[in-house]
Amino acid sequence: MAEPAEPAPHLIVTGERVALGPLREDLVPVYARWITTLEVARGLGNTIIFTVEAEKGWYEQAAKPDPGQAHFLIYDRFDLEPIGTTGLINIDHRHGTATFGIMLGERRGQGLGTETTRLVLDWAFTVLGLHNVDLMVFAWNKSAIRCYEKAGFREIGRRRGGAVCMGRRFDVVIMDAIAEEFTGSVLSGLVPG
């Protein structure tokens, strides 16, 4: 007898090559594996080895209904494999601001991060009605900076020497995107108007 097929994941936002859905508790060990790879840890500035138990604590906090955060699981749209997590934190509805974050655990360097970033910005501006989304990235991470620029972020400043990575000091680049400059919304057609 054949194994029952795994149910299709719940997708909230679908782009051309990626889709966003809710975080899944069954993937906590995968999240822990992603965040402890050297490339991801270096990009996030982590010096801590995350255990499955520690990542479960993050998941439990991130999965709580909270108007101050919106977390997503990133899927490859074609094979529906989870490839990372993304979201907004510090959402301030009064001032219309939030901070963006992304962790691609799989399939980096294929433009999927750029599309994911655009989808989250679209969610922020179109669904949440925010005005400004910011992020911070290490200056040495040129590929991430290019990704963010392609998605609509612009550099607005630097914290000079604000980070140490592998014994060397680097600037932290501060970037933001604003609703008025965001183009190419895939969600705007869904908003009644």
Residue ranges and their predicted role:
Residues 1-107, 169-170, 177-193:
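GNAT-family acyltransferases
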Residues 38-39, 128, 151:
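Structural motif
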Residues 80, 111, 141, 167:
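Conserved G/P- and acidic residue-centered "switch" motifs that form tight phosphate/ATP-binding loops
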Residues 110-124, 142-150:
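Conserved acetyl-CoA-binding loop-helix of GNAT-fold acetyltransferases
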Residues 126-136:
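Conserved GNAT acetyl-CoA-binding A-motif
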Residues 135-145, 162-166:
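Conserved beta-strand-loop-alpha-helix junction that forms the acyl-donor binding cleft
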Residues 148, 153, 175:
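Conserved active-site tyrosine of GNAT-family acetyltransferases
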